[in-house]
Amino acid sequence: RYVSWLPLAHVFGQLVDNHYWVRRALHMSIVDSPLNTVDYAKEVQPHLFISVPRIYEKVYSNLKAAIETKAILKIGLKIPLLSSIFKKKLRQAAGFGSNRFSISGAAPINPKILEFFHYLGIPIYEGYGMTENTAGISINYGGGNKIGSVGKCMPFFDLKIASDGEVLIKGDNVMKGYYKNPKATEETIIDGWLQTGDVGKIDSDGYLFITGRKKEIYVSSSGKNVAPLVIEESMKSIPIVSQCFLVGDNRKFCSALITLDMSVILRDHIGVDVNEIPKDPSKQNEMILANDKKLS
């Protein structure tokens, strides 16, 4: 079973929804809206689940909140004889009761979240790729997983790090070029190597770690190179923070634009039951404003 919510306008959605599910004879359930993805997972209990980090972050936040507020869960998970029973119930409640393999991609995911899911017995693995190389170049998997990395290079492809730290890719999965844009193609594919624009490193075991985007690295007025990705992801580990955008080019200091997670405010600060929180952010905001009026 597989829950499909990836946009078919993207190559990864095309790869999985139009090819992989046929080859593997998967029963595919198509989500009517990305906002309902987790609800579909709870109903379908898919064996395969593919997502961006944000959905895993939401599931993680709700599970952690449930554990913190329910003493029986908090205590039960610490007792060896009961731990497996409670973990199974939590997996089922989150929509991962039958899950065999899950992929996280498109953006970095906090290692703490992956560690928590693996602790519960939910096998979520981080991978890496882009449209220009047909979605995938490296991935973690059972028996070959290093949390914090995006895995090892897949067979039949080549991967290396340039002198400036940029990740370079070579293989039959790399595109021929951009449609009717030879200039962009020449700048992106040099001597057969795809210039990804991502900065990373490969450790002694062959695992790839992405540390930032080449074009996003900026220089402060004091001359220090700043990779915003690491700081942004650290800020997003705070439950109430939804998104974070760092700026500081040619400045003495870094500033951050932060958006709050309305569902966490409703759940943790107003006391609304998770199942009663609307999926639509605008409706979440209306609930918060209505609560503020009551308090005033």
Q: What would you call each of these model-derived segments?
A:
Residues 77-111, 288-296:
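Alpha-helix-centered segments that form part of catalytic cores
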Residues 22, 201, 205, 246-248:
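Membrane-embedded alpha-helical bundles of multi-pass transporters/translocases
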